[in-house]
């Protein structure tokens, strides 16, 4: 759930069936498009970036690619990505996405609210929700309380792993790693965060 760029899901090669969900329409259009052979560009100019941002529905697959892959920090149309060394972010993003898609050719990509996803029996669920007190893709603040309530319910019949920085007391961290985040293109605003992987306490004995 909240599959994003699928960087984690693409490495889980031992699963025979994968259902990857995200509520971002253009992201799922991109993933399905690449899966079905859509040819991504090797370069996007700033003028093209601005045009695509203003005409999102002309080519939703391309919009998904440019909106994330050619934007600063991978944030949805968060500004045309550039640096002093002239990195070609479009080519970089294309290479990364195509590499990840090699192991996702049999995956099913769907676009739903996470609560609407039908779960087969005995699922292994990996969720990477927006951080608590953030807006996620849109302007509306993500409701973390509802998500953790959902995670409690889902953990009764499935094993659910949640990537977050913090969690309610009944969720236990089984892994953590510090990362450096950057808020601006000049890398002058950096800060350290610790990413953690949580499971509900009822599932703790199943993952050790």
Annotate each predicted stretch with a short phrase.
Residues 1-19, 23, 106-127, 131-208:
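Class I S-adenosyl-L-methionine
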Residues 16-111, 115-116:
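Class I S-adenosyl-L-methionine-dependent methyltransferase module
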